[in-house]
Every structure is written in C-alpha cells, then in structure tokens.
Amino acid sequence: ILSNPLPPGTRKIGSPGIAYGNEVTILTTDLSECAVNVEGEIAVRGPNVMLEYLRNPETTKSTFHGDWLRTGDLGRKDADGYLFVTGRLKELIIKGGENIAPREIDEALYSHSDVVEAAAFSRPCETYGERIEAAVSVCEGSTLTEPDLISICIEKLGNFKSPDTVHFLSELPKGPSGKIQRLKLQETL
C-alpha cells in the first residue's frame, strides 16, 4: 500500500513512504479527514483492500467508514503525502480527555542510554479516566531509578504526559513478531 520512491525520489526517515495504487487518509475521531501533520487513524482504500469480513456484517460495519478501511493504526501525513505511523488506536492513552501516544513516552525513556526496552501504557484512574505507567528493562549494572526516569519524562514531555510509575523488568513481553505487547503489560503488572 505504501512505498518509498526509488531514487531520485525522496525517502524520509521514519516513514514507510507514500501511497502507490491505493489511497491513504488520516481520520479524526469524528471520521472527517485530518489536516496535514495532524495525528489520527490511518484509513486506506483501493483495488487490493478487502471489501468485508466474511459473514460478519457487524465487524465490517465498525471497520469501514464508507469505502475506507479503518486500520486501527495512528499516524499523520506530511504535506508531501508521506505517512508516519505513530502507534495503535487501542494503545492510545486518554488522560483527562487528552490523547497521548505511548510511543512519545517510550522515546523519552529511550533517551537514556541505560534503557534497553521501554513501553508506556495506561491504567484506570478515577480523576483522569486513565493514568500513565511505563515498564523498562535497563542494561546490567545500571543505577537508574524510577525517580530518574520520571524526571527525564517530565523534562522532555511535561508532568501531564509523564508516567506516575515506572516498573523495572528483566525483559518486556513480546509477541511473535518481536514487538513489545503493551496490553500484556496492563494485564500483568
């Protein structure tokens, strides 16, 4: 669906490219099209995009907006049409009505050289609806503490987007593809 152009075309770091043979758009929560560089849900349509779930009209209805397939992925498109994937909709943290991408918090945690793996996730909260926690694994011999990592996040993201708690694990849970499973962290910690 997406591809980086061949030389002399431009490749952009962090982007899987632009749409070829299909269309890609970014949808707001009310399913209208987002402006350039505004994050929303990635939707695709084209001749090789599925039409429906077999014998499952309810799932088909919730997955499609007209002929646009809603992917469940979050992203943004720049002015040149390059897509940047920023996360998964079901992993989005909604704190006090504000959408917070967990990857933003991950990147703040990864900014310390002792952090080997990092993943932010949400927990229910009576005050804000959801609160932020994170899990990290650090290199052997590291003296990093929870307050150290929270301070890094506050410095880079501000207090509102920073985790309340940071869990230290020897290894974060991963799926078959090797991706860290945030939802598993929610269940097990």
Regions found by a protein language model. Give the residues of each.
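Conserved ATP-binding loop and adjacent catalytic segment of the adenylate-forming AMP-binding
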Residues: 1-23, 36-40, 49-51, 65-66
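A structural motif
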Residues: 42-44
